Swiss-Prot record:
CDD domains associated with the record: IscU_like
Domain of life: Bacteria
Gene Ontology molecular-function annotations: iron ion binding; iron-sulfur cluster binding
Coiled coil: none
Any Pfam family: NifU_N
Listed InterPro entries: NIF_FeS_clus_asmbl_NifU_N
This protein's name: Uncharacterized protein MG337 homolog
């Protein structure tokens, strides 16, 4: 991993802006991992006029899944539900194909730059994958 990226990750992990108590959030979901992973996060979402106005998380996970939660929520704050779905789909497609076809917001770009090996991919995708599915279900 590039030294600059490592320094950014450490700085973000040392000052998680979205890790908080979730009692004030109207909508909450819990991420689900596979049987080989004990990481879990509760995600809190606030909407106003179809826009994500506040996001938060709490729970336990490795540094990769924690940073992925923080950066995913950072990238989606202020977006409409439709915009959030499109961004998450673009990110998931890039990770699955190994190719970035469209520019990503800075926070998701940093996740892309992680260069995670296959063994840790579940950690990276825990929050983006679960949040994408929840937003799709919520919007229908």
């Amino acid at each position: 991993m590039d030294r600059k990226i490592r320094e950014q990750i450490i700085a973000i992990y040392s000052n998680l802006q979205h890790k908080q108590d979730l009692t004030q959030f109207a909508h909450c979901l819990t991420t689900k991992a596979d049987d080989n992973c004990e990481d879990f996060f509760n995600l809190g979402l606030q909407f106003q006029n179809n826009q994500l106005t506040a996001l938060g998380f709490n729970g336990e996970g490795c540094i990769i899944s924690t940073i992925a939660s923080e950066l995913t929520l950072s990238a989606l704050e202020g977006k409409t539900i439709k915009e959030a779905i499109v961004l998450l789909e673009q990110f998931m497609e890039a990770v699955q194909t190994g190719s970035l076809s469209t520019p990503l917001p800075q926070a998701l770009q940093l996740l892309w730059d992680f260069q995670i090996d296959q063994k840790r991919l579940n950690c990276l995708l825990l929050t983006p994958q679960n949040l994408l599915q929840w937003l799709k279900d919520f919007s229908h």
